[in-house]
């Protein structure tokens, strides 16, 4: 899939996949996400996602209903136990920065986790297959969402480093990530529902048949 390519399928021949970078990312055009998709279109998008890892659908004025319908083509949707959701749509998280909001000591702890490299909801026993972001308002500057190819990062590690991390386990802890935002009672309920998830640092991506890094705090270290 080097350069611009069209998906060869009777029902998906209008879909155009245009890579945006050498390692990951592609724009998908020739499709309207405000309308139901055919199985062939869904299969084409899934194949593009496995290959390119990050997909961009530009100028899609989708509603909340469209957002949920599109997500369900790829599996069951998950809510979030802490982050606010859209009224009537528990599957959609509501992420907003108020106009003119200043970074103060009070808001910094809330903004800090999202302003560093992370993968969402890894505290679940089974990590999410993907997330679907919809931008409604873009800041005049900044506000970029940046993606990294963790499979490429792992592939480029020196052999001695790969050997060192071969058996390392990472601890994915919902309380470490969100405990400061909830009451002690709520934290106890979260811990009961989401026990500490221990996962191998070197994780497998089954669909792409590749190894990648799924990092977090390493067990036995500060």
Question: What residues fall within each predicted segment?
Answer:
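Non-heme Fe(II) oxygenase catalytic core, chiefly the N-lobe of the double-stranded beta-helix
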Residues: 2-222
């Amino acid at each position: 899939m080097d350069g611009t390519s069209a998906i060869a399928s009777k029902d998906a021949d209008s879909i155009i996949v245009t890579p945006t970078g050498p390692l990951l990312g592609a724009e998908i055009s020739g499709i309207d996400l405000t309308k139901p998709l055919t199985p062939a279109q869904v299969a084409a998008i899934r194949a593009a996602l496995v290959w390119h890892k990050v997909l961009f659908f530009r100028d899609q004025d989708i509603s909340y209903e469209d957002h949920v319908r599109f997500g369900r083509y790829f599996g069951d949707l998950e809510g979030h136990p802490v982050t606010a959701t859209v009224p009537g749509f528990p599957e959609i998280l509501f992420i907003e920065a108020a106009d003119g909001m200043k970074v103060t000591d009070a808001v910094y702890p809330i903004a800090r986790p999202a302003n560093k490299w992370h993968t969402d909801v890894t505290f679940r026993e089974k990590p999410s297959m993907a997330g679907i972001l919809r931008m409604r308002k873009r800041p005049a500057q900044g506000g970029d969402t940046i993606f990294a190819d963790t499979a490429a990062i792992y592939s480029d590690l020196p052999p001695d480093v790969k050997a060192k991390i071969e058996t390392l386990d990472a601890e994915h802890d919902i309380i470490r990530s969100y405990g400061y935002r909830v009451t002690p009672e709520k934290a106890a309920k979260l811990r009961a529902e989401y026990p500490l998830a221990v996962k191998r640092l070197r994780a497998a991506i089954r669909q792409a048949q590749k190894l990648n890094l799924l990092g977090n705090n390493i067990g036995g270290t500060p």
